[in-house]
């Protein structure tokens, strides 16, 4: 990771492979919090390229706990941490879309930068967000709406979550 740190300090772009390796490392028990924080901050400050975002997404998709869903399912994943301080639009949109007949697999987490993330909003409505994969799939089948709580669907984020929480912004590369 030292080589990536040097590269980012020089404001050099990472390759797809380097970005993927970085995010895999951040999401591992081997990650050193101070180094991971520095790397994520430098990446954000430099500006994340499409290649870096694709590498990060590839790394995350390789470690996700997937649900079985129909082809026509949609997701209203939150943009959280956008700095605009809006109310929880993505959660409202998920509920409205499902009520209108769409199949919605809402993905989200607790807030990192505002008062209420999707998890807090749904808990306030009495929703049990800590469901296993099979229970989430059953919700999607029975009511055309489910919540994929990030902590349960991205178990490797248990390592990255505390690192991201200590930063003053949400790092797009690890969302």
Residue ranges and their predicted role:
Residues 169-175:
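Conserved small/polar residues in nucleotide/adenosyl-binding loops
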Residues 45, 91-105, 123-125:
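Alpha-helix C-terminal capping segments
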Residues 121-139:
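A glycine-rich helix N-cap at a beta->alpha junction
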Residues 82-94, 114-116, 157:
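Short glycine/serine/threonine-rich phosphate/pyrophosphate-binding segments
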Residues 57-80, 133-162:
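Self-splicing inteins and homing endonuclease
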Residues 75-76, 104-108, 129-132, 147-149, ...:
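General beta-strand structural signal in soluble alpha/beta enzymes
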Residues 78-83, 108-114, 153:
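Acidic, glycine-rich active-site loops and adjacent beta-strand->loop/helix elements
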Residues 1-85, 100, 104:
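Acidic, glycine/proline-rich low-complexity segments that act as flexible tails and inter-domain linkers
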């Amino acid at each position: 990771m030292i080589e990536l740190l040097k590269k980012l300090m020089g404001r050099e772009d990472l390759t797809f492979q380097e970005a993927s390796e970085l995010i895999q490392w951040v999401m591992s028990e081997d990650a050193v919090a101070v180094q991971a924080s520095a790397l994520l901050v430098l990446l954000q400050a430099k500006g994340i390229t499409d290649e870096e975002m694709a590498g990060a997404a590839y790394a995350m998709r390789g470690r996700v706990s997937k649900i079985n869903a129909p082809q026509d399912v949609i997701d209203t994943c939150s943009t959280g941490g956008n700095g605009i301080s809006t109310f929880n639009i993505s959660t409202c949109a998920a509920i409205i879309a499902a009520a209108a007949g769409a199949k919605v697999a809402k993905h989200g987490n607790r807030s990192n930068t505002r008062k209420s993330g999707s998890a807090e909003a749904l808990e306030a409505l009495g929703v049990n967000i800590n469901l296993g994969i099979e229970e989430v799939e059953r919700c999607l089948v029975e009511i055309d709406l489910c919540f994929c709580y990030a902590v349960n669907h991205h178990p490797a984020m248990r390592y990255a979550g505390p690192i991201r929480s200590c930063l003053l912004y949400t790092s797009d590369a690890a969302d």
